[in-house]
Amino acid sequence: MDFTDLIDLASERLGGAVLVANDDFFAPKENLLKLSAPIFVEGKYTDRGKWMDGWESRRRRTPGFDWCIIRLGLPGIVRGVVVDTSYFRGNYPEHCSIDGASFSNLPTEQELTSDTVQWVPLLPEMPLAGDSQNPFPIHYEERVTDLRFKIFPDGGVARLRVYGEVVPDWDQLKRAGGYIDLAAAENGALVLSCSDMFFGHRHNLIMPGRALNMSDGWETKRRRGPGHDWAIIKLGRPGQIHRVEVDTSHFKGNFPESCLLEACNATGLPAETLTDLSTAWTTVLPRTKLQAHTRHFFDQELLDAGVASHLRFSIFPDGGVSRLRVYGTLAE
């Protein structure tokens, strides 16, 4: 799996934030994590210069570098980053680097910028190209909560995407009691693959909160032949399923006629084997009719599938679903 198929741990929709920057004279640091793709507006200026959709520092006249500190929305293991310099052509940094740190608490800005923080190099100083997507794999196997992003010597970056595997605090989740959403992104779940995601990304299924609109769900193209669409989800931890929610909010003329939820215990198996016909799936929710723009809750209808590590969520024949919630208990 390419690292860009993983969750963006720093996404602002997941709570990621640029806490502090040493300089954002031309364009604010908050732009760095915006969900939308960067844009360019010809002829748009502010009282400080050309308006740019990114983070941009002033021209450096002394030796050094510029930096910002980012709190990840979801702590985890970083597998790769994309440094997007779109529209920064004569004002992009020559190089960048990234350090990481892990905190059990929420340090203040003053604490994060002090010399006491033990920053670990995740990405050494690497050259950047202007007006480009600059992908870099990361090889560090520890959980990270915060990043320090350095640009050399100065300039502008449109977006920073930080892809990785979410590592939740399971002890804290257990102490909270009750059922855990095993299919939630914040609990380490991941949509490994799907048949189609023409109109809406598969990861939207497991994002926190309610969908903002139709684009914030998983939606497939119109099916013109036989068959149906599906998504395969790796649960955050194996567990037993007790309650399911299928939310079709915002999907009114394009919701699926019905859905089916199946499970298997494939811990340790390669993800690509889950699409093999030989994989034995057990029904959790039999094929059930759905309604438009509705939150559907199922508990009595569920069948006992034992301990599950992965799910196959099928929709018939096509359409869109905003969110899938799968509540259960962790396997011992």
Predicted feature locations:
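Trp- and acidic/polar-enriched beta-sheet ligand-binding modules for extracellular glycan
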Residues: 1-67, 87-230, 239-240, 252-332
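A short glycine/threonine-centered beta-strand motif
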Residues: 72, 235-237
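Active-site-proximal cofactor/substrate-binding loop regions of enzyme domains
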Residues: 76
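Short, well-ordered alpha-helical microsegments
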Residues: 79-80, 157
